[in-house]
Design a protein with these regions (language model features):
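N-terminal exported-region signature
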Residues: 426-570
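Structural motif marking the loop-to-transmembrane transition
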Residues: 2-4, 114, 484
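Short alpha-helical patches at coil-to-helix transitions and adjacent helical residues
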Residues: 14-16, 225, 555
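Sec-dependent N-terminal signal peptides
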Residues: 4-15
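Short, surface-exposed loop and linker segments with low hydrophobicity and enrichment for Pro/Ser/Thr
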Residues: 15-24, 232, 457-460, 528-532
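Histidine-/acidic-rich catalytic cores in large beta-rich domains
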Residues: 19-427
Length: 570
């Protein structure tokens, strides 16, 4: 029996693998520049639970945060533009959608005098993209709203906004602006005057510093960064958004069911509260409630809802970078007080609950970015950005899998996707087909809609697909049951999605034939040969050379010799 062994070598160091690891694909971008991947180039990797690199994408511009995998196998990549209009840690500015074959389907820039994308994005189920942007405000605009001081030589105050992009036409179809939800208690001569503690749904414009003379994450110069949002996540069931503010040491939830007009006000949407905050947690002193004991979060990153089907579903999980001190971090989980209507009750004069949280892991620290994602089997995938260390722990905190490359790298965040993530129906499956540098004997193990070799094997060399009849024939499409030569410039893996091929009937000519099998391995003893035309011992595959085989593996093709024309069945 022919054994297939694929060796893919990158500059990596995998140190541990356990049987309890969640079987799936880890996606992350690895870069060498400060700021969690910003600056120079980077490489995005899709790696399976056996630590095999399934696919990689090279980028000329470094990552702003983590990439996102779509069910069609393309990725959404937020990256740093060369000359951002506003610059601080986590700066981005560009968002691309890149196919499995490395084609850029679209590329949008959000870097101008008004808006500058930074950190995270969030792909939505409808295909749109939520984008975090700084929104530039002058010192005078801030003073006119009651701000008392500006803490940077730019004389700017960068507010925040969330824009929803329809990538099919480049239009912004929904937006939320933090500037529409301010309060101040300085004077009734300014707008939004009120008692801060009576309005936890609003942001106190005088809370926190408005920028600095220099920023974290790469030694940026003067900036007007006030909130430093760094993560965004969407809850489909609630139609709500959660964001994380490092400089406020808080997370915030708002309603996404509003219109843009409602999002600018204080009424409308499922909550009836417009774009006001539905919930906030981490530092209630920001809205003049609670005390130092209630100040839990510090410079946190990576907040996200735990998905349905995973332990803790509906809870929030995040990486608390400064947990108790500026040199120790932790991954924590919290159960929000959300009710059946998607609202978050709060008592008068009290901070939002919960009073306590679930400690997931506390033996970790990273100054920049970082994140955590719960897996369906109960494990948690954690990323230490500074040390480029991704590791998966079980409920007892024991490491089940880890990735830590040698060299000076950073990884903003990583997340995993299940093996069944790619586009599938009840009748379809996804298969990984490995290939080596040079010529390979390949076959099509599934019924597919698009038979083009450029689509099925996008990393193959153009014009190198050949079948064999009475001689070699150049082809552009693959058919089930037929074998082909195809050339590749590098080792790798292709992912093919389609429906099962349970049985085949193949017509053969006298002499040598090039064939392929079904979705499942085919034992030669189970091949039907009613005419007795197969010459014994003449099934050959190709690896480093020709090899006699006993089993036809899916996705590969084989030579077989016959004594005459006829039909065989699997």
């Amino acid at each position: 029996m022919r054994k297939r062994i694929t060796v893919v070598i990158y500059l990596i160091s995998i140190t541990f693998l356990s049987a309890e690891v969640f079987e799936g694909y880890a996606l992350f971008t690895q870069g060498s520049s400060p700021g969690g991947g910003g600056g120079g180039g980077g490489t995005t990797y899709l790696m399976d639970h056996n630590s095999t690199v399934i696919k990689s994408w090279s980028h000329s511009q470094g990552a702003a945060s983590l990439p996102y995998l779509l069910p069609d196998s393309s990725i959404i990549y937020p990256y740093r533009v060369p000359n951002p209009s506003m610059n601080n840690g986590g700066v981005g500015g560009g968002i691309q959608r890149i196919t499995w074959g490395n084609d850029i389907l679209w590329n949008y820039i959000f870097s101008n005098a008004t808006y500058q994308h930074h950190h995270d994005i969030e792909p939505l189920p409808n295909g749109n993209i939520l984008i975090i942007v700084w929104e530039a405000k002058t010192a005078q605009e801030a003073y006119d709203m009651g701000r008392q001081s500006i803490d940077n030589p730019l004389n700017m105050m960068w507010s925040e906004a969330i824009l929803e992009l329809d990538p099919d036409n480049g239009e912004i179809v929904w937006e939320w602006h933090l500037w529409d939800h301010l309060i101040q208690d300085i004077s009734n001569s300014y707008p939004n005057y009120g008692v801060v503690s009576e309005h936890p749904e609003l942001f106190d414009i005088n809370n926190g510093t408005a920028g600095s003379s220099g920023g974290p994450g790469g030694g940026q110069g003067p900036n007007g960064d006030w909130m430093h949002l760094n993560a965004i996540n969407y809850n489909t069931e609630l139609d709500q958004i959660v964001i994380s503010s490092a400089k406020q040491s808080e997370i915030f939830i708002m309603d996404h069911s509003t219109t843009t007009g409602e999002a600018a006000g204080h009424a409308g949407g499922n909550s009836g509260k417009g774009g006001d905050l539905l919930y906030r947690w981490g530092n209630p002193q920001n809205y003049d409630r609670g005390n130092n004991n209630d100040h839990i979060l510090g410079h946190q990153h990576g907040v996200n809802w735990i998905h349905e089907g995973s332990p803790g579903a509906g809870n929030l999980i995040l990486f608390n970078n400064h947990h108790n001190s500026n040199t120790s971090g932790a991954v924590i989980e919290l159960e929000t007080p959300v009710d059946e209507n998607g609202n978050y009750p709060i008592e008068d004069g009290e901070p939002w609950g919960p009073e306590s949280f679930i400690m997931v892991y506390n033996d970790i620290f990273t100054q920049m970015q970082g994140g955590a994602f719960r897996q369906p089997n109960g494990n948690t995938l954690i990323t230490d950005c500074d040390d480029a260390h991704i590791f998966e722990i079980n409920v007892n905190g024991s490491t089940q899998w880890e990735y830590n490359p040698s060299g000076n790298y950073q990884i903003p965040r990583a997340q995993k996707y299940g093996l069944d993530y790619f586009d599938q129906t009840e009748e379809s499956i996804t298969m990984e087909i490995s290939h080596s540098t040079g010529w390979n004997l390949v076959g099509l193990p599934l019924e597919v809609e698009n038979h083009s070799y450029e689509f099925l094997f996008p990393e193959s060399v153009d014009g190198t697909l050949y079948s064999f009849g009475t001689g070699y024939v150049q082809e552009t499409e693959l058919l089930v049951g037929t074998g082909y030569w195809l050339r590749f410039s590098d080792d790798g893996i292709s992912i093919i999605t389609g429906s099962n091929v349970y049985e085949l009937e193949i017509s053969l000519i006298e002499g040598w034939n090039l064939i392929s099998g079904t979705t499942d391995p085919v034992d030669l003893n189970n091949i039907g040969d009613p005419g007795g035309i197969i010459i014994s011992g003449t099934f050959y595959g190709f690896g480093s050379g020709y090899e006699n085989v006993d089993v036809l593996e899916p996705g590969e093709s084989y030579w077989v010799r016959t004594s005459g024309a006829g039909v065989i069945t699997f």
